[in-house]
Amino acid sequence: MKKKLAYMLSILVFGVFLATGCGGKSTGGGNNAKILLSINAMDDFRQTLVDAAQQEADAKGVQLEVLDASDNIENQVEHIKKAAQEGYDAILCGPVSADTAVELKANAGDIPIVFFNSCPDEKQLSEGEHIYVGSDESVAGQYQAEYVLDKFSDKEEINVVIFKGPKGHSATNGRTKGVKKTLEASGKKINYVFEDYADWDGDTAKKMFELFLKTGSKADCVICNNDGMALGVVEACKEANIDLSSMPILGVDATADGCAAIEKGDMAFTVYQSGSGQGKAAIDAAIKLINGQSVKDIDGATDDGKYVWVPFEKVDSSNVSDYK
């Protein structure tokens, strides 16, 4: 009798083991799902995104753990390994480098990944498994170029300075291409009198623009891939007593400082990128993937189910008060 009871108990325990899975993975879905968020590095915009993701996770009954890779690829790989070892249901990943997508996916195993902030190559994305949530970076550049073309509609030749983010970053590439494609499609003669990578940093952009001014070259406008670099250029112009109304300076992100600069007339234009919208959409997309569903019915999703686009918005002196 004791042997029979022990045998039945062992069968029951084995059945529970199979039901729960050896990795300890949670039940998935909205309630009690476990999601790990690995951010490349924290700044004001990314903090807004993470805060919104946490708020949406709380609202949907999802457990969210946030880890900061501090711009270190090895740290981020360890985050992904942790998610795999501890049975997380999904991963949100702002990659330190979009080029590491293959390695990140390999370490995640069968855990779905929602990439954000820096977009991997399309070949690394697949419907229902590995998708990207963000804003179409080329549109930000397009909006900047449209502002410049409207401002200088009476000029046939425009001298342009461009400050770019980190080399190889998807936002750097997309925004810069959007600017150039739109400017060059206008039929005007576009002279790129200075162009370099300032890596999102205002101090770097300031120093570079000071060097540009020493060359004696003339610029009609300065287009920056983010507000931080634009504000660095503003500072350089003020120290050189340059009339900012005669040379519009443009950024992206509509940060608090960027919007304040537009109100003062120091910056001319920026593009609002909704960190809160991206954070919410990333959680919603992750829940879809956990449930084995496509993200196609999320607002902004593409027909192939690989992307969820959160729209950019134009910001200038006429509407900047709406973004404070």
Please identify what each model-predicted range represents.
Residues 29-31, 76, 131-158, 205-206, ...:
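Hydrophobic alpha-helical segments within soluble ligand-binding/sensing domains
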Residues 33-56, 65-78, 82, 88, ...:
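Extracytoplasmic "Venus flytrap"
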Residues 57-69, 159-162, 183-202:
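Short beta-strand elements in bilobed, periplasmic/extracellular small-molecule ligand-binding domains
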Residues 91-113, 179, 198-260:
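Hydrophobic alpha-helical
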